[in-house]
Curated annotation (Swiss-Prot):
Zinc recorded as keyword: no
Region annotation (Disordered) ranges: 156-187
Keywords carried by this UniProt record: Chloroplast, mRNA processing, Plastid, Repeat, Ribonucleoprotein, RNA-binding, Transit peptide
Keyword Plastid: yes
Superkingdom of origin organism: Eukaryota
Gene Ontology molecular-function annotations: mRNA binding
InterPro entries: Euk_RNA-bind_prot, Nucleotide-bd_a/b_plait_sf, RBD_domain_sf, RRM2_NsCP33-like, RRM_dom
Subcellular location(s) per record: Plastid, Chloroplast
CDD domains: RRM2_NsCP33_like
Protein name: 30 kDa ribonucleoprotein, chloroplastic
Amino acid sequence: MASSASSLHFLSLTPQTLLLPKPTSQTTSLSFFSLPPSSLNLSLSSPSSCFSSRFVRKVTLPDFDQIEDVEDGDEGVEEERNFSPDLKIFVGNLLFSADSAALAELFERAGNVEMVEVIYDKLTGRSRGFGFVTMSSKEEVEAACQQFNGYELDGRALRVNSGPPPEKRENSSFRENSSFRGGSRGGGSFDSSNRVYVGNLAWGVDQDALETLFSEQGKVVDAKVVYDRDSGRSRGFGFVTYSSAEEVNNAIESLDGVDLNGRAIRVSPAEARPPRRQF
């Protein structure tokens, strides 16, 4: 066929009777009924892409208006499939030019990708540097996190985390902040007065790096980097909790001004946290 899609048109027929004469005296009549003008479209398109079985979304913030392309060939699909939150993966530190197709192609190496979302700013239309990938099973989620956390995509090391943000502690003075990788290391209660504030952190520093550095000065009960709940990016500061006040003093004296990933960190008692600087 010359074109990629063809249409067969049915003409409107008015009620009428067609008489067919026969050798006998009897006649046979065939009745035709009125049909409204209509068109039957037969689409001849190119083979479906490798992402034809999933949704690929472009989501804008802050009110999450979205444009949704359903690429499974079924024009009757009106509602998005619901997936378990356990199957959703956060992907941060994306290059602004990275789109959902690039993410889908990458994460398919770890399993079947059900849906991909890249978050865009509604006003500027630019990517906000993070998105979400939904896999088919928990095993694939674990495989993707292990395989792609720290993976370099277009020159940037991805941050890949699974599951919902951890529950916030009631005694926390920073309840508005949510970390995709947080929570108490010790699994028990601790004295918040033995906590130090750590500022001027490089964006790539995570809680593991904090714990490694601060464990040189004592027993680290808890280490946390604070992340922005919308972008998923580090806010450039965090907290470390020790088991005693003596360890807190040692950490402040020894680590304040120490270079960590190219930046001189600021260490002070959490209660006397200095105001944040703009970088």
